[in-house]
């Protein structure tokens, strides 16, 4: 499981190098997060079930600012944890949405000590993630 702060899509090796250089300039102290609301991407055809993390807004803003020269800020984007990818739902969207609305959980807090530049490759068996660079939070 990981927290997505920004989705870049398909980018070249040159762009990856530039992103690495930009993210290396971010200075962040360890910070606390807790689970927020659950939701889906595309209510019409659910593809992703996610949860928002409260407390990640500052680092998301820093990432957006660091990358703004080459990647536009998505106004509607919200940092999130992908809980599930959905391949196919046959007329079950309303049941999933109702379940998520009624979902209850203990709002545990966690400390984030780093952020990672990740590569994801979608395969028929699911996504494959590779850590390209880890950026440590500093006190």
Say what each PLM segment does.
Residues 1-139:
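Histidine-dependent nucleotide/RNA phosphoesterase domain, centered on the 2H-phosphoesterase fold
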């Amino acid at each position: 499981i990981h927290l997505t702060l920004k989705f870049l899509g398909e980018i070249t090796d040159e762009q990856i190098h530039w992103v690495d250089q930009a993210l290396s300039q971010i200075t962040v102290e360890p910070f606390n997060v807790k689970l927020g609301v659950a939701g889906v991407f595309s209510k019409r055809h659910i593809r992703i079930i996610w949860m928002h993390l409260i407390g990640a807004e500052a680092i998301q803003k820093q990432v957006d600012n660091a990358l703004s020269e080459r990647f536009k800020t998505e106004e509607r984007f919200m940092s999130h944890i992908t809980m599930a990818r959905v391949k196919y739902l046959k007329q079950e969207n309303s049941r999933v949405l109702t379940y998520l609305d009624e979902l209850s959980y203990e709002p545990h807090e966690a400390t984030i000590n780093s952020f990672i530049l990740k590569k994801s490759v979608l395969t028929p068996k699911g996504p494959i993630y590779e850590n390209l660079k880890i950026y440590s939070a500093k006190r």
